[in-house]
Amino acid sequence: MNAIATEADVLRIENQGPPADLPASTYEMIGRGAAIDPTAPALSFFLRADDHRKPSRWTYSELMRDITRTANMFSRLGIDRHSVVAYVLPNLPQTHFVIWGGEAAGIVCAINPLLEGPAIASLLKAAHAKVLVTLAPFPGTDIWSKIQPILSQVPSLQSLVLIDLAERVQGWRRMAARVMGRRECKRLHGRAGLRGAVPRHIAIHDFDAAMARESGDALLASRRFEADDISSYFCTGGTTGLPKIAIRRHGNEVANAWSVGQVVGAGMGPGKTVFCGLPLFHVNAVLATGLVPFSRGAHVVLGTPQGYRGDGVVKRFWEIVEQHRINFFSAVPTLYSALLDVPVDGWNIDSLEYGLCGAAPMPVEVFRTFQDRTGVRILEGYGLTEGACVSSVNPPGGERRLGSIGLRIPGQMMKAVILDDAGRYVRDCVENEVGVLTISGPNVFAGYLQEDQNKSLWLDLDNGRQWLNTGDLARRDAQGYFWLTGRRKELIIRGGHNIDPATIEEPLHRHPAVQIAAAIGRPDVHAGELPVAYVQLKAGATATETELDTFIRGLIGERAALPKRIHIVEAMPLTAVGKIFKPELKRRETLDALIAALNDAGIEGARVSMADDPSYGLALHVALSDRAQIAKTHTVMGRFPFAFSTSVEPEHQ
C-alpha cells in the first residue's frame, strides 16, 4: 500500500471505509500485528547509549506473551474493565507490557515521573488507582523517593508492583546492580526494608516475578472487548499547568492507529524499524512509536529509560540510526534543533526515511537546515491527547508544505470555524480564513474525568456530529492542507492587535546564534499585554539582546509585534517531552510586571506569589509589610485581569 500523497487519497480511503473486522481493542490490534510474523523482532531496548549495539530483544511472539502475562497478573490483582492500573515509569520494555497488558485487563493511567510527589498523589487519587506500577529503589533514580511518601495518601490503592532496574542491566554488571539496589533500599529504610516503608494495607509485588508466574498463552479473564470500553487515562496540562485526565476508549486508539497506518502505508510495516525516544507517558510515544508500528509488524527500538534525554543518546543518534537501520523516528522541534549540533558526516543514515515532528510548531529555519543537512524528510503534523494522538500530518507520498500541519487523517473530520464571543458556532471558515480548529471522529476522546473541565469543550455544528474545540487557530488552503496560525490562549493581545507568537519567534530563529526562542505576552495596564521574547543561544555562540533586537526589526512587519524586551537565558524551561513550557515564562513576566507596578506606586517590599486555581486560572497573593498599603495595593492590582488577595505579614507589622 502506498503512502498518502493528496487529499484525494484521504477521500478514497474514507470511501472504502475501515475494514469490517477492525479490532475492538488495542490488545487484539497488537495481536494481529504479531501474527504477520511471530518470529520477527518487535521490541529492542538498550539501557545506556554505550550499550546500543547489544540490546535486549523481543520477537512478536515474545512481546504478545509478556503483554498477556502482564494482563493476567493485573487480573489476579483484582483489575477489571472498570478499575485502574497507574504507572509512574521511565521508558522500559516493562512499560509497554504495563500499557498494553493494563488496557487488556482494565484501564491504564499514565503519569509523568518528572512530576513532584504531591502532583502524582493528586492524579492517583483522581483516577482512583487500584494498582500502581513504579520503580523499586535504585541508586541514581528519584522516582521511589517521590512515590513512597505519598502512598498513604491514596485510599484506593491496594497493590504496589515494583520494577527492579537492575534486571535490565546486562552481563556481569547485573549482579553488581542487584547489590546496589539492595543497599539503596537498606540505606533508605533500614532493616524494615520495603515492607516497613509501605502502608500495611498495600500489597507489594515484584513485577518480573509476578509476571513470570502467569500464562502467556491467553487472557485469563473471559473479557469480551467493546470499542467503547475505556482503555486509558492520559494526563494533559492546560496553559495554567493544571492537570486534566483525558478519558480514552479502545475504539479511539484503534481508530487513530489504523488511520495513521493508512497515511504511512508500507513506510511502517514488516522490515521497518522505528526509534522511540519520547517518554511513554505521552501519547506520541505510546501511539506513533508504539501501537502503530506494533499493529503493522514493525520493529520498535526503545533507547534508554530517559529516551532522548538519556546520556549520549543525542550525541550518538546518527550512530544508533546506522547500527539499527532506523527508518522512522518522532521528536519535538527542540530535539531536531539539538541534532543540528551533531555531525552527520561519517555515518550511513540512508535507511532513515522520515522524522515526524509534533507537540509544537517547527521553526522554519530549523526545518530547512535539518532537511538540507541530513536529507531526512520531516513530516510536520498536529495532534493532541484528546484526539488519541495524530489528527493531521504532511503526506509522506506527496508535497510536504513547509510550515503546514498537513492533511487531516482518514476517518477524522477537521475544519476551521468561526465562533461568537460566547464560544458558540457561527459558520464554517471559507478557504484560507482563520478560525478555531475543530475535529470530529472515532479517534476523539470521551471527555475529561473531572466534569467541570468539559465546559466549552464540545461544539454543536448543526450536523449531528460531536466536534471538539481544540483551542487552536488555523486555516485550510485549497488543497486541504491546514496551517496553524496560533493558539487562542497563547495569542499576545496588545490593545486591539492579536499577535501570533510565531511572528516574533520565526525571525529570531533565523539568527545564527539562536537555538530556540519563545514569545509571550507581558501583562500591561495600558495595552493589556506587551510582547516579550526569550532566547536560548546555541552552545558556544554569542549575541546580545541589542543585537537580536536590531536583527529582527527588519523581519517583523507588524510594529505592534516588536518585542519590548528580549531575554537571553541559559536554558529554556521545557516540558517532559521537550516542548517549550510557556506557562513558566508567562509566570516570570507576570510576577515581574506586578512587582514593578507595585514599586511604581510606592509599595515597596511587597511579596507576590501565584498559584493555579481551577476556577480563576492564575490566582495571586500579595503579602504586605504595612496595613496602610492595602487600599493602594487593591487599586494597583485591580488594573490587572487576575484574581488576587492580600495579607499583612505579622512579622513585618
Predicted stretch roles:
Residues 103, 254-276, 283-327, 342:
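Conserved AMP-binding/adenylation subdomain of ANL enzymes
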Residues 115-125, 130-137, 322, 329, ...:
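AMP-binding/adenylate-forming catalytic core of the ANL superfamily
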